[in-house]
């Protein structure tokens, strides 16, 4: 701890190597790179973080979703490009009320389907199946509003949160801004 110029106390943290960090500096790193355990081993160099998060994403999406679907023989999730577009949409809209219909409309209106197999708007049931696969793989979590008095879920739109904010930032190119939704996502998991 040390006194700040404003008279308050600033927390300082020392790592195993004796390196001293300011608590705000560590929080800023967490909101940017997330809290995946391997980051403690590889450090916070952007190239290494990007490679590690790409590995997590590839393992979760390719192995946990696409390969699992093949093994189950259901073949519900067949379009890897559509899956990625839905992931990108949800990552970009954490904490927003979201529906399968709004995802489909956005993908079509913004021309986001033109580089995949699909040229038309996917069915709502298809988008729901893809979102279901993402929540089953624990990449995203859906939160629905609950009426405490009526003891039932409301029929309003749900919100989605991503399992690790670093994964979201990796997917969206580590862009700046959107701190409100980033903080909301972090608080959801605390």
Question: Which residues are covered by each model-predicted region?
Answer:
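Accessory nucleic acid-recognition modules appended to NTPase machines
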Residues: 41, 45-190
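Amphipathic alpha-helical "lid/sensor" segments that cap RecA-like P-loop NTPase cores
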Residues: 4-60
